[in-house]
Amino acid sequence: MTYAVKEIFYTLQGEGANAGRPAVFCRFAGCNLWSGREEDRAQAVCRFCDTDFVGTDGENGGKFKDADALVATIAGLWPAGEAHRFVVCTGGEPMLQLDQPLVDALHAAGFGIAIETNGSLPVLESIDWICVSPKADAPLVVTKGNELKVVIPQDNQRLADYAKLDFEYFLVQPMDGPSRDLNTKLAIDWCKRHPQWRLSMQTHKYLNIP
């Protein structure tokens, strides 16, 4: 299949359980919860998204004719001769495009694969690290994985229900924006009252990591 990718870049993972880990980020274009266009935000299921996933005009972005072509670009960004290859498939919603041929090609190239998904679409069991960031008004079909990362606050959100799911790590992350300081306090207070949960911060924004 042809893969539409917004951007591909090498950096450090800034948030979640893998914060600080070097990774190639492959941001797929498109999402099933929002068109990505500002004029549609009020009608979106996810109205707080802070990511540009529209089109294929970002760094190293484009339309890739097959899995091998996409993997070649991803692999070309990893430091030459270095092991511990790791790619984060994100979006948008990566499960609109991430398929078994691409997973197989990435594994063949020596990459561990993480996915950042909203959890409303089934994921492939062959993915190495599953991070689900559920949206309160969207269906949640992925109920087990490695990491559940919940952005707070959201309307109609019930964190206590998420705690019953089958994940290794449970994280709350304060929503960015003008209320970030208040949201951070809410997240800290939640973790202190419910020790099953950990705090996730978007460290790349605080440290200006590109």
Swiss-Prot record:
Keywords recorded for this protein, A-Z: 4Fe-4S, Iron, Iron-sulfur, Lyase, Magnesium, Metal-binding, Queuosine biosynthesis, S-adenosyl-L-methionine
PANTHER family in the record: 7-CARBOXY-7-DEAZAGUANINE SYNTHASE
Cofactors required: [4Fe-4S] cluster; S-adenosyl-L-methionine; Mg(2+)
Described function: Catalyzes the complex heterocyclic radical-mediated conversion of 6-carboxy-5,6,7,8-tetrahydropterin (CPH4) to 7-carboxy-7-deazaguanine (CDG), a step common to the biosynthetic pathways of all 7-deazapurine-containing compounds.
Residues holding S-adenosyl-L-methionine: F48, C49, D50, G92, S133, P134, K135, Q173, P174, M175, D176
Top-rank lineage group of the source organism: Bacteria
Subunit record text: Homodimer.
Phylogenetic placement of the source organism: Bacteria, Pseudomonadati, Pseudomonadota, Betaproteobacteria, Burkholderiales
Species of the source: Burkholderia multivorans (strain ATCC 17616 / 249)
Protein name in the entry: 7-carboxy-7-deazaguanine synthase
GO molecular-function terms, A-Z: 4 iron, 4 sulfur cluster binding; carbon-nitrogen lyase activity; identical protein binding; magnesium ion binding; protein homodimerization activity; S-adenosyl-L-methionine binding
Record: residues binding Mg(2+): T51
Cofactor binding: number and manner: Binds 1 [4Fe-4S] cluster. The cluster is coordinated with 3 cysteines and an exchangeable S-adenosyl-L-methionine.
